[in-house]
């Protein structure tokens, strides 16, 4: 039996040391530590989604470049609109949650999207002004924006499609503020028109 000895090495937090066969020799290498928790436990924030994909992922790179060019996310929203910033974020979130799944457009394929609830006029009337501002129905005399929202899920397109119902529901609930900025947000110009 070969004699062994113990050594201690420091390994970065996101890596692990692993013995591997390389060129006929056994060597100790550092490899990325894989988080095996379900994706819905790993991705709770937009930042989590960016980290899951990595800074070199094209969607993350584009977002970071635009934020840098605009001198911050707030300036980017002023430059391009909150809905555009929200779309960029939702692309990243969707890509991360789908873990490599992309629609193939086959006849038997299902794609899922978040679905948002329409409030009754009574429920709407009990909202704060800020809550009312975030509802699609505020532009109508009635808060029942039936024609305004019932079909809007189909307008999300395949870029924001999920591989299963659970992921779509999770994304809609967990990232509701980002979805609201994408789907429902009213620009300041539209607010001024409503006040007239």
Kindly label every feature range from the protein language model.
Residues 1-2, 188-196:
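Short acidic DE-rich linear segments
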Residues 2-84:
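Charge-rich, low-complexity N-terminal segments
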Residues 66-124:
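Acidic, glycine-rich loop-and-strand cores that form catalytic or ligand-binding grooves
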Residues 108-157:
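Short aromatic-glycine-(Arg/Gly/Cys) micro-motifs in beta-strand/loop hairpins
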Residues 145-147, 167, 179-180:
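Extracellular/cell-surface secretome signature
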Residues 163-177:
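A short, charged, amphipathic alpha-helix used as a generic interaction element across diverse proteins
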Residues 175-186:
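Short arginine-rich
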């Amino acid at each position: 039996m070969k004699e062994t000895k113990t050594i201690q090495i420091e390994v970065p937090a996101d890596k692990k040391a692993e013995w591997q066969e390389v060129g006929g020799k056994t060597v100790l290498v550092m490899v990325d530590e894989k988080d095996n928790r379900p994706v819905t436990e790993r991705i709770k924030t937009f930042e989590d989604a960016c980290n899951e994909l990595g800074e070199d992922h094209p969607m993350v790179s584009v977002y970071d470049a635009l934020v840098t060019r605009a001198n911050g996310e707030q300036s980017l929203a002023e430059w391009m609109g909150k809905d555009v910033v929200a779309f960029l974020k939702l692309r990243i979130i969707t890509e991360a949650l789908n873990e490599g799944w992309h629609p193939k457009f086959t006849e038997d394929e299902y794609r899922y999207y978040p679905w948002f609830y329409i409030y009754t006029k009574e429920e709407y009337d009990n909202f704060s002004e800020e809550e009312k501002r975030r509802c699609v129905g505020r532009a109508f005399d009635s808060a029942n924006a039936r024609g305004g929202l019932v079909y809007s899920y189909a307008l999300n397109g395949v870029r924001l499609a999920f591989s299963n119902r659970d992921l779509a529901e999770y994304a809609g609930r967990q990232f509701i503020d980002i979805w609201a900025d994408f789907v429902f947000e009213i620009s300041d110009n539209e607010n001024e028109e409503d006040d007239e």
